[in-house]
Amino acid sequence: MRQPLLVRTLWPAVVAAWLCSLLLASPRASGQTAAARGHAALDTSLFTHSENCVACHNNLVTPSGEDVSIGASWRSTMMANSARDPYWQASVRRETIDHPARSTDIQNECGACHMPMSQRISAAAGGTPNPVFDHLPIVNGDESELHRLAADSISCSLCHQIAPDRLGSPESYNSQFVVKPIPPGASRIIYGPYQVDAGRKTIMRSVTGYEQAEGPHIRESTFCASCHTLITEAFGPGGEVIGRLPEQMNYQEWQHSAFEKEQRSCQSCHMPAVSGPVRISSVLGDERDTLNRHVFVGGNAFMLHVFNRYRAELGVTALPAELDATASATMRQLEHDTARLAVSVPERTGETLAFDVDVRNATGHKFPTGYPARRTWLHVIVRDAAGGALFESGAVEATGAIAGNDADLDPLRFEPHYQTIRRPDEVQIYEPILGDSKGAPTTGLVTATQYLKDNRLLPR
């Protein structure tokens, strides 16, 4: 089979509707100013916009001629566009509509990973609420530095200021990483994986206000664990907490994989290192070995195409070619590095043809992992000698639905796990299905209290 495994997270037909509803519902669409929203006076000096970093960390080329510019690579990733993601925006909107009494809590919790700089700034101001939709729609050239930092998503000065304190511990989960405040009269500390000489430290401090520090933790899986371990609270009708759910457990899955024993970190796959020396700055930069590409390839090629198609509506700054390149790199990883599939020699008994399909996870986490809307399935076709289809399970329809999938026909049903597929309307789908407190299927993250199904492939 040429395409036995397919991953989809979204139906194209509904993207335009999401964008329309978000723009119509956003408070910012009314022309409300930053001062009117009460954010103008907040101190934003802890973070800096990525454009200030890109000025020096672009135009980086390997000896073989590969462009590994950090800024150009990063700005076309899901990390750089986490605040622009319309699927995420629609999900937050849905959760706040379902649980209005918890609207502020939901927006702060979701913004902690998707709009982390604006959320941290608001929290440092004494817990000032930082509603997600105060920053939407994203408008390039916005008058407020807080909004610019919100739109900058998971940016340079956010990740590189994360201190090693408590990383990998339960206290760090749900984005509870440590970014230390600026001591009076001191410079902000910016971490990188390399030793720093005094001369370049002085140059960096005088130009940017940041003081470089060696931080090996930035290459460890514990560094990723804070945002990629998410335990959600489930809310009842009045906003009361009625349960907790391990919604995303990428780090714990990695801990129980061969990758942890082999000391293969998250970064080794999602930020593959350059082989050979390369300058890490276009201004007086040293050549360094094993520079990690800031490509952050993952499981979401589709959304990268959405960013290209709706550039103006979503305030996208990455160039079309950059988004296409990142989407292509994501698809290459999905096609070649995620799973191994083998089909046995078919056995015929009368009019019945039987064969085994062996699917093995090749990653260091569940496949698929992360956000529980992701699914992977088998698309199986049996053809006759002339190429005609005798049997097909798992076909993709024009709407993006999977033919025969119960959940695509009725949201209160879902496809069970199969040991044997006998009919075209039986489809092997590896996925999590969330359930509410009454045992009914739900896609609401803060409505869910349990898993009704989780047959995702376990880590290698």
Question: Language-model segments: which ranges?
Answer:
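N-terminal secretory signal peptides that target proteins for export/translocation
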Residues: 1-8
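Bacterial N-terminal signal peptides
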Residues: 12-25
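Boundary at the C-terminal end of the N-terminal hydrophobic targeting segment
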Residues: 25, 29-31
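N-terminal module-boundary/linker segments of secreted carbohydrate-active enzymes
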Residues: 32-64
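Primarily the internal scaffold of c-type cytochrome electron-transfer domains
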Residues: 33-37, 60-97, 127-460
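Residues immediately within or flanking Cys/His clusters that coordinate Zn2+
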Residues: 46, 50-51, 103, 107, ...
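N-terminal catalytic scaffold of extracellular/periplasmic and nuclease hydrolases
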Residues: 53, 88-109, 119-122
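Conserved, well-structured interaction surfaces
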Residues: 112, 116-123, 134-135
